[in-house]
């Protein structure tokens, strides 16, 4: 498993956090501010692609 660092808006995070639990992907919250949230996920490349594709899907 690899670590992937993500900077997300609260909109993205609100939608993604339930999916991370559903997909059994571990994450840690590194930093939060008024604009967004930094997280690190521990995932295989296949699961990481699933996460990135889901974030893209939020904006379609």
Residue ranges and their predicted role:
Residues 38-45, 58:
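Positively charged, small/polar-rich N-terminal and surface patches that mediate targeting and assembly
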Residues 10-12, 57-60:
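Proteins with a high burden of low-complexity, intrinsically disordered sequence enriched in S/T/G/P/A and R
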Residues 33-37:
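Short acidic/glycine-enriched loop/turn segments that link adjacent beta-strands
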Residues 1-32:
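N-terminal acidic leader/helix
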Residues 19-22, 50-59:
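Short amphipathic alpha-helices in soluble, non-transmembrane regions
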Residues 9-13, 42-49:
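Helix N-cap motif at beta-to-alpha junctions
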């Amino acid at each position: 498993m690899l670590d992937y660092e993500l900077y997300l808006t609260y909109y993205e995070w609100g939608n993604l956090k339930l999916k991370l639990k559903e997909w059994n992907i571990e994450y840690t919250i590194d930093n939060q501010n008024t604009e967004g949230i930094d997280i690190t996920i521990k995932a295989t490349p296949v699961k990481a692609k699933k996460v990135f594709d889901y974030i893209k899907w939020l904006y379609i």
